From Swiss-Prot:
Phosphorylated during mitosis. This is RecQ-mediated genome instability protein 2. Pfam families: RMI2. GO terms for molecular function: DNA binding. It comes from Mus musculus. The modification Phosphoserine is found at S8.
């Protein structure tokens, strides 16, 4: 039954996103911009530089500061660069978080990686209340990628 649920389409009509079956991979915007290969529905993160096989990018987890938001889209920045998120009008957000300066987590499906990453949002959460989230994010991502075989 869980498999059937994970294969369903999210509600929202046109542009609905197929919900991922794998947990999201924590990434930085710069990693997607420099090391992503493939295309929509078949993105991979190259790890050839460290002698490892690429990672499938079904869904990603990114964090960043909101630079601008309008009409269900937002532009964010993490420590490695800017990225865009769309489809925000259809995702659960909890507290209002689409305000410039807010630090947020976005889980989404990669739509593009160049010239800058763009995600179709599945979930968004405001992390602004605890500055540790922002200060530790780059280290969390680095640690994860160092330990994935």
């Amino acid at each position: 039954m869980a498999a059937a649920a994970s294969e369903s389409l999210s509600s929202g009509g046109p542009g609905a996103v197929r919900l991922p079956r794998l947990p999201p991979l924590k990434v930085l915007a710069g990693q997607l911009r420099r090391h992503a290969e493939g295309g929509p529905g078949a993105w991979r993160l190259s790890r050839a530089a460290v002698g490892r096989a690429p990672l499938e990018l079904v869904a990603v987890w990114m964090q960043g500061t909101v630079l601008a938001a309008e009409g269900g889209q937002a532009r964010l920045r993490d420590s490695s660069g800017a990225f865009s998120v769309r489809g925000l009008e259809r995702v659960p957000r909890g507290r209002p978080c689409l305000l410039p300066g807010k630090y947020v987590m976005v889980m989404g499906v990669v739509q593009a990686c160049s010239p800058e990453p763009c995600l179709q949002a599945v979930k968004m959460t405001d992390l602004s209340d605890n500055p540790v989230h922002e200060s530790m994010w780059e280290l969390e991502v680095e640690d994860l990628h160092r330990n994935i075989p």
